Amino acid sequence: MGKTIMIVEDDQSFHDIYTEMLKDTDYEIIRAYDGAEALVKLGKEKPDLIILDMILGMMNGDTFFLYLKGMPEYKDLPVIIISSQSKRDYKSLKDVEPHIIFLDKTVTKEKLIEEINARIG
């Protein structure tokens, strides 16, 4: 069985785009539509990497990320943030900045797979 990626994204079309980009890989995909749902799913499944949108419904990406990194069992879990905003827009992430991989929403399939493989491939 391949490694597991959790996609935390509130927009169904972006879920579909990322899933399509990864369909020819061995990665299993878990979907969550906001940070709160992702936390519930983390109680049941442990992904090898999280792809995280920043602007979400119930719990935004920055809040989820900081909560996740505060949990000892997930502090080293790789997270790739995909957002239409830049990393500078998230002052709350300043202290963990060296550990953040930040990609634009227009990321190519090749770049996304390259970044994932560099972390868990």
Region spans (language model):
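Alpha4 helix (beta4-alpha4-beta5 surface) of REC/receiver domains from two-component response regulators
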Residues: 63, 85-103, 109-114
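Residue-level signal for the "D+5" position in two-component response regulator receiver
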Residues: 31, 56-59
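Acidic catalytic/metal-coordinating carboxylates
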Residues: 34, 60-66
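Active-site residues of response regulator receiver
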Residues: 53
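Conserved acidic carboxylate
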Residues: 9
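Two-component/phosphorelay signaling modules centered on CheY-like receiver
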Residues: 12-30
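Acidic, metal-coordinating helix/loop segments flanking the phosphotransfer/catalytic sites
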Residues: 31-49
